[in-house]
């Protein structure tokens, strides 16, 4: 035991080393040339440490490579899903055969595209066996005393409208017994056959004038339309008959004639073609004077009105050779004898009385074919269609006016074209009676660069627009898949969020890092970091259910806050600088928040409760007076929302971009604040001390020294905050109307790419066009964040290099440090 008072062992050891060594006489004297040898083991690292170090090194390297592989894996997956959207159509010629018997008539294909059939005014429909080339007759149920004199083919309904010599009309529906996949029906007919509707005369008294030379048919569900061209001694007559379903509680309703109409007197020439619409309220007639007539059914008067006459729709004296409906019966495809190909669609036309009337107008124009347009076949699932000239066939898509495929030159001249409803098979007949079969592979005609980013003139709209309306309530809905409204909404929401978040977060970080007392900073910074963990769904609910209703009528109060609070803070700061130094030194640095917090809260409460309301009505009156002087007219407004709607003519929604800016700002502020504060706190103290030694004030130090040095970190914080705002989903989904519109109006909503994916992806069919376009939106988000982060890293490295050089020149040398 050491003696008391000798001090700690280290001090005793130091004393013993400094005192002379006392040697006993018997001990040998050490050799002056012998030195103690170092022990090699003291410099060796334990094997377990080396083993653990190697494992951790490989683990970290492997983790880094895994992250890189994962990122590129996501990229490759998104590319694999979206690349098919930009691929064109593929049409391949299959077998070509000549039926064993002459097959004159009108050809059709069943929905599966595997069973061709033909009809030619007889009492049999012939189904073609593609393996043997034989025609199998299937009888048509017609009365023995009726003879068919005219027919046509409706590919959308897979039916033949027929007319008999006695002036009666009906429909022969054809079914092959196969489903769309070419398999035997599990439900419904399992064998090829026909169904014939009851025959009805085209006049009320049954006395039909002349012989029917043309017949057309449309089915609108509860209403069916027949139109015929009757050859009489006075010339062709155009007759129209409507059938409506009779309702009964005991049995299914039967279709009975409900109206007979003779439209001959309202024609400008002789009718040569007619197209009743499957909507049941429209009829298109082409005349020999090259005019296109549009008749519409008036529900009130129960009459057919001629609404429009289009003279020479192809222009330059070119005559129409084909007039056909596009799928949906909202657009007409017109072909001419010089190869012109145009689309006319229904859309509102302003009238003299201020009303708008839906009329046809030219919306699309295709490059001309190399000969007259002769034949036409339309898809039954989208706006694709086929047209042919004497030696070429072209596949087009009506919505985007794209040519999906075109044959270079056929070795035969098509006499007929037919396609199945699924539009994956086509047949063409030639002058020698041979039938040529083609397979069509065009899975995503609705997509493509023009549809996704270009302005498209959609049906029902009076001009080309960027629109996103991916799904509709009917099978013939025209999908609108422009991504521009979604990209615009993403940028709009991000902009309004950053306008609110960046000044608050950066200024708060500056104050916390260099002005706030350390004791308070130890509380504030963890609270802000905890705030970053708030679920976005909670913030979204807060914005939608609490903040949006309260902000709807408080916009003037918010404007007053934005102006008054910074002004009042600057005024108090100026007043503080005018006080004597002896008086200011009584308060510790960083305690300004004790004075400013109550003032800011009191100012915000005063603006919210009183000032906004006091200024709202005078502002409305002043605006009304100014707009009256400008001749903008008078309007009524009881609030700012009414002024915005009625006075400025812009929409004002409760859930709008202003709400998104505030709520998303709360999600972005903690991210920007935390990273910025770390960058500001890590500025070398030597720079700050040198600035203080030169007599700079705290604000001068922050403005001229701290902010430039920390600019790289602050810029990184802004970019990370930008990425957080770009990818936000739930806040935008809940706090806005989620409407895909392109409008910078701050009181309007928007839809972002991320919110659109979250909303629509669960309902999208796998591998459909809609499904792939949603993944394309994800690829755009991925690219946006990747590009932004890459640019941010480049800028950050340059800023860091620049100010590291400055630090190198201003830092003391090692000799100065000693």
Question: Which residues are covered by each model-predicted region?
Answer:
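Short loop/turn segments immediately following beta-strands, especially the blade-tip
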Residues: 174-184, 242-251, 296-302, 345-354, ...
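Loop-to-helix entry region at the N-terminal start of transmembrane alpha-helices
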Residues: 480-494, 548-567, 586-671
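Transmembrane-helix boundary motif in ABC transporter permease subunits
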Residues: 497-528, 572-578, 792-801
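Amphipathic cytosolic juxtamembrane alpha-helices at the membrane-cytosol interface
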Residues: 517-525, 593-600, 689-716
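C-terminal transmembrane helix and the adjacent membrane-cytosol boundary/short C-terminal tail
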Residues: 571-582, 677, 681, 685, ...
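Interhelical loop and adjacent transmembrane-helix boundary motif
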Residues: 639, 643-650, 732-782
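Transmembrane alpha-helices
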Residues: 673-675, 697-734
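Conserved small/polar residues in nucleotide/adenosyl-binding loops
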Residues: 809-818
């Amino acid at each position: 035991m050491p003696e008391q008072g000798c001090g700690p062992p280290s001090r005793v050891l130091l004393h013993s080393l400094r005192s002379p060594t006392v040697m006993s006489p018997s001990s040998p004297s050490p050799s002056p040339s012998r030195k103690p040898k170092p022990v090699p083991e003291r410099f060796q690292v334990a094997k377990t440490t080396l083993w653990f170090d190697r494992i951790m090194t490989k683990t970290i390297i492997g983790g880094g490579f895994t992250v890189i592989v994962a990122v590129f894996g996501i990229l490759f997956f998104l590319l694999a899903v979206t690349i098919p959207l930009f691929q064109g159509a593929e049409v391949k010629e299959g077998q070509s055969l000549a039926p064993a018997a002459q097959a004159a008539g009108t050809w059709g294909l069943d929905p599966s595209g595997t069973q061709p059939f033909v009809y030619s005014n007889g009492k049999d429909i012939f189904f073609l066996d593609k393996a043997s080339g034989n025609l199998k007759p299937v009888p048509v149920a017609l009365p023995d005393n009726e003879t068919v004199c005219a027919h046509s083919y409706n590919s959308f309904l897979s039916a033949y409208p027929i007319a008999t010599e006695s002036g009666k009309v009906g429909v022969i529906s054809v079914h092959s017994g196969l489903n769309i996949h070419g398999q035997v029906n599990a439900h419904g007919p399992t064998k090829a056959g026909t169904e014939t509707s009851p025959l009805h005369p085209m006049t009320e008294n049954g006395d039909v004038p002349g012989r029917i030379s043309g017949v057309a048919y449309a089915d609108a569900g509860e209403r069916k339309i027949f139109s015929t061209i009757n050859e009489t001694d006075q010339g062709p007559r155009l007759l129209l008959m409507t059938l409506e379903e009779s309702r009964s509680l005991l049995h299914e309703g039967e279709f009975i004639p409900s109206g007979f109409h003779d439209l001959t007197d309202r024609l400008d020439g002789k009718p040569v073609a007619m197209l009743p619409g499957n909507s049941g309220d429209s009829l298109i007639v082409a005349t020999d004077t090259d005019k296109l007539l549009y008749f519409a059914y008036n529900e009130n008067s129960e009459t057919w009105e001629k609404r429009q006459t289009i003279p020479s729709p192809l222009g330059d004296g070119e005559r129409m050779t084909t007039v056909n409906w596009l799928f949906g019966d909202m657009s007409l495809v017109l072909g001419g004898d010089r190869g012109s190909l145009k689309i006319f669609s229904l859309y509102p036309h302003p009238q003299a009385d201020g009303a708008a009337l839906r009329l046809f107008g030219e919306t699309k124009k295709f490059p001309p074919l190399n000969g007259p347009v002769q034949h036409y076949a339309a898809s039954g699932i989208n706006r694709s269609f086929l047209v042919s000239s004497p030696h070429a066939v072209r596949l087009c898509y009506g919505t985007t006016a794209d040519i999906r495929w075109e044959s270079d030159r056929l070795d035969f001249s098509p006499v007929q074209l037919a396609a199945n409803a699924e539009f994956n098979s086509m047949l063409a007949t030639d002058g020698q009676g041979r039938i040529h079969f083609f397979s069509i592979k065009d899975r995503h005609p609705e997509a493509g660069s023009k549809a996704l980013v270009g302005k498209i003139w959609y049906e029902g709209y009076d001009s080309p627009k960027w629109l996103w309306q991916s799904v509709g309530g009917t099978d013939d809905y025209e999908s609108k898949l422009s991504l521009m409204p979604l990209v615009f909404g993403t940028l709009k929401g991000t902009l309004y969020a950053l306008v609110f978040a960046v000044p608050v977060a950066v200024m708060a970080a500056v104050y916390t890092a260099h002005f706030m007392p350390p004791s308070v900073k130890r509380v504030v910074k963890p609270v802000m970091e905890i705030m970053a963990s708030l679920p976005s769904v909670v913030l979204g609910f807060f914005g939608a259910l609490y903040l949006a209703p309260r902000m709807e009528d408080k916009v003037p109060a918010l404007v007053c806050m934005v102006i008054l609070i910074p002004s009042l803070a600057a005024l108090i700061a100026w007043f503080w600088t005018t006080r004597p130094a002896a008086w200011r030194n009584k308060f510790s640095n960083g305690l300004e928040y004790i004075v400013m917090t109550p003032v800011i809260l009191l100012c915000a409460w005063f603006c919210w409760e009183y000032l906004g309301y006091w200024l709202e009505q005078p502002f409305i009156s002043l605006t009304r007076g100014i707009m009256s002087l400008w001749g903008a007219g008078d309007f009524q407004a009881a609030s700012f929302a009414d002024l915005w709607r009625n006075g400025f003519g812009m929409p004002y929604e409760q859930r709008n971009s202003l709400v998104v800016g505030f709520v998303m700002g709360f999600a972005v502020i903690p991210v920007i604040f935390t990273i910025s504060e770390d960058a500001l706190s890590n500025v070398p103290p030597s720079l700050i001390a040198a600035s203080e030694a030169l007599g700079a004030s705290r604000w001068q130090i922050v403005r001229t020294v701290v902010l430039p040095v920390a600019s790289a970190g602050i810029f990184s914080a802004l970019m990370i905050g930008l990425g957080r705002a770009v990818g936000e989903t739930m806040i935008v989904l809940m706090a806005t109307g989620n409407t895909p519109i392109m409008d910078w109006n701050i009181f309007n909503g928007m839809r972002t790419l991320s919110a659109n994916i979250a909303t629509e992806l669960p309902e999208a069919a796998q591998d459909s066009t809609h499904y792939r376009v949603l993944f394309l939106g994800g690829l755009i988000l991925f690219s946006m964040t990747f590009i932004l982060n890459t640019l941010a890293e480049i800028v950050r490295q340059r800023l860091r290099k620049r100010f590291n050089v400055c630090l190198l020149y201003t830092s003391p040398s090692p000799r100065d440090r000693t």
